[in-house]
Amino acid sequence: MSRPLTDQEKRKQISVRGLAGVENVTELKKNFNRHLHFTLVKDRNVATPRDYYFALAYTVRDHLVGRWIRTQQHYYEKDPKRIYYLSLEFYIGRTLQNTMVNLALENACDEATYQLGLDMEELEEIEEDAGLGNGGLGRLAACFLDSMATLGLAAYGYGIRYEFGIFNQKISGGWQMEEADDWLRYGNPWEKARPEFTLPVHFYGRVEHTSQGAKWVDTQVVLAMPYDTPVPGYRNNVVNTMRLWSAKAPNDFNLKDFNVGGYIQAVLDRNLAENISRVLYPNDNFFEGKELRLKQEYFVVAATLQDIIRRFKSSKFGCLDPVRTNFDAFPDKVAIQLNDTHPSLAIPELMRILVDQERLEWEKAWEVTVKTCAYTNHTVLPEALERWPVHLIETLLPRHLQIIYEINQRFLNRVAAAFPGDVDRLRRMSLVEEGAVKRINMAHLCIAGSHAVNGVARIHSEILKKTIFKDFYELEPHKFQNKTNGITPRRWLVMCNPGLAEIIAERIGEEYIADLDQLRKLLSYVDDESFIRDVAKVKQENKLKFSAYLEKEYKVHINPNSLFDIQVKRIHEYKRQLLNCLHVITLYNRIKKEPNKFFVPRTVMIGGKAAPGYHMAKMIIKLITAIGDVVNHDPVVGDRLRVIFLENYRVSLAEKVIPAADLSEQISTAGTEASGTGNMKFMLNGALTIGTMDGANVEMAEEAGEENFFIFGMRVEDVERLDQKGYNAQEYYDRIPELRHVIDQLSSGFFSPKQPDLFKDIVNMLMHHDRFKVFADYEEYIKCQERVSALYKNPREWTRMVIRNIATSGKFSSDRTIAQYAREIWGVEPTRQRMPAPDEKI
């Protein structure tokens, strides 16, 4: 017999997480048992916690498969326009809890595991993150898949099944160390290998010109084997597919030409082909022109396009003969969205298939390609833009280079016709960049070959039209759009912050989960004492829970009553973790100067990974840990200030830290962060934002009201003016005593007594070549932080401001973003209609 439930536990069954019916719980226990014994071949005497996790995962997966098969059958019969989201990154995180939430199984599973003497939360912690992304771009793709399924779109995510995802970060002596992320070591219960759909991908070789046109011959072949992962919509019985390709060597690999005794070597060399899907490149907002990376980009594109065309051609009447030989209808049945330029080779590859294999005239093929493809830009940083050396493409993809040259020739003819005599414009707009090394500008290729080009926040889309893509905007203004990013409220509220989701549902019902604009109804509760109390209580519980987690995992003590000041994102100069550091040191100096004065206690937490080859980013991590070593051990400071570096920041850690945050740091130099999505997660979870007018911060402040936002610093126009005038760090150093003191401490080795010049590179950069103008925003940032502390002293007013932020965060649902892509780019209509469940008649 299980113990009787307390009233509070009984009430928890009235929940956004769905009811636990008795039959359901019994059934789940039965299936759990079956999987433990028959799938995992274990009994309770030898089963490990991981076995129990797998048994639960397979049990939950059973509830997906009927819906998955039914959804795919439905698409086959109805033949809707299909959306293909191509991305080199999908930063999924964990799948178990998200699946339970979307299928309304969470309560029943909780009860079933409890009755079996297991703790579901402990089992959830065993799952490895699927870390197939670096940061925002990959996580956006994952949120988009969730929204596309929730909105009933016939959508597919296509990418690479990296054997090793983003590295695990270990901090040793204050320095970042990288460890391989062997996430598949124990197997992945959520994927289904589909070897029967394996496809060939060609590399190298040469082009033969025949009477029938160009032929790409003498190529090396690598096989692409697909692994499918189900993507469930929110309680609508839709389950879409994410298909990730894995590289396999063909069976005759290197055996055609092996010499006597070369058989063993030929088999060992299969690894070379299979290296294509071995590891994710760990660069965020930085282009590294490596051949293996170019192979990855073509690999995903070539396999995916074959799959798309196979699906387009196959009829819905079950006959194997291709029925559609005419490609006129292709853009009516297929939309391809390019997530940044990484899959840009889809454009020449589709042209190659249409012209060389399907024998379409160039003009017709080009019309089909442009109508099918659309391109999302994610950055304006010049070092992040992909510019592939011509000699690399020529070696690896000789036919594609010819096609790119032809595209360029015809494109420049159009430009010349539109702007006669403007030779410099031709040079600027060419897909081919002349120079010491000839390069292909992949963004230019994407704009020329797409019918829509979008930025990811209003300010970013404007910057594209006014600066890096100005010439293209003048030629084809109709192509340019904005689609402000969003986040899925299923993972980023219901799943990671059930306490908050619950008290919201008690006031306005549960419909907001799939219609986030309904959060506006909370504006009428901004003076409701019981709601104010509930919001503050949930936040305090989340802070206590996160404090306990830090203590358990990292043996760090923090004061849960302090202001939790959090900056978690990739470590990059443009994101200005250094500005945060300068504030922390300034606070420290103020406490030391007036030790008896009252200071609002703060725990500053900074987390994020640095690209392994990015020296400055690694120095920034070392600086944060060095500041922590001084501040956290100074008895004068006590628990008024703590500095914590959050090791190995990833999706599953974000889900823990974001609900506990009081203050969200979004402090990039205006004009550098395309959108940001972490900012939205904090807003939805009841943190206030301190930030510059950059990316989506601008629209968040507009929605919430600037008076409910801590805005500081230069605007884009100010940055431009300062660039024209010339940014001189020295003048800020000379003028601002507190800043000067901080920099002198860094220079003198105050934070690195054993190596006094440890931070000389950082000081030198800040003083002499700081592209991101940290000093220019220092004064306003410090003043703004004083306003933050002052408000935090008044908990009621703080919480009222939090409620206003939560209530106005509805715009930042990825459901809104995807509905706009659907209507304005893909030409399909989203729907919240349910599919019939597997046990219902259609």
From Swiss-Prot:
Site (described: May be involved in allosteric control): 156
Cellular component aspect of the GO annotation: cytoplasm
N6-(pyridoxal phosphate)lysine found at: 681
CDD domains linked: GT35_Glycogen_Phosphorylase
Acetylation recorded as keyword: yes
Residues the record lists as N-acetylserine modifications: 2
Sites of Phosphotyrosine modification: 204, 227, 473
Residues that, per the record, bind AMP: 43, 76, 310-319
Transmembrane segments: none
Catalytic activity: [(1->4)-alpha-D-glucosyl](n) + phosphate = [(1->4)-alpha-D-glucosyl](n-1) + alpha-D-glucose 1-phosphate
GO terms for MF: glycogen phosphorylase activity; nucleotide binding; pyridoxal phosphate binding
Regulation: Allosterically regulated through the non-covalent binding of metabolites, being activated by AMP and inhibited by ATP, ADP, and glucose-6-phosphate. The activity is also controlled by post-translational modifications including phosphorylation.
One Pfam family cited in the UniProt record for this chain: Phosphorylase
Modified residues (Phosphoserine): 15, 430, 747-748
EC annotation from Swiss-Prot or TrEMBL: 2.4.1.1
Gene3D superfamilies for the chain: Glycogen Phosphorylase B (3.40.50.2000)
Keywords: Acetylation, Allosteric enzyme, Carbohydrate metabolism, Disease variant, Glycogen metabolism, Glycogen storage disease, Glycosyltransferase, Nucleotide-binding, Phosphoprotein, Pyridoxal phosphate, Transferase
UniProt xrefs under SUPFAM superfamilies: UDP-Glycosyltransferase/glycogen phosphorylase
Record GO biological process: glycogen catabolic process
Modifications made to the protein after synthesis: Phosphorylation of Ser-15 converts phosphorylase B (unphosphorylated) to phosphorylase A.
Cofactor(s) the protein needs: pyridoxal 5'-phosphate
Signal peptide limits: none
Subunit-structure text: Homodimer. Homotetramer; to form the enzymatically active phosphorylase A.
Summary of the function given for this chain in its UniProt record: Allosteric enzyme that catalyzes the rate-limiting step in glycogen catabolism, the phosphorolytic cleavage of glycogen to produce glucose-1-phosphate, and plays a central role in maintaining cellular and organismal glucose homeostasis.
Family, as annotated: Belongs to the glycogen phosphorylase family.
Protein name per Swiss-Prot or TrEMBL: Glycogen phosphorylase, muscle form
Organism per entry: Bos taurus
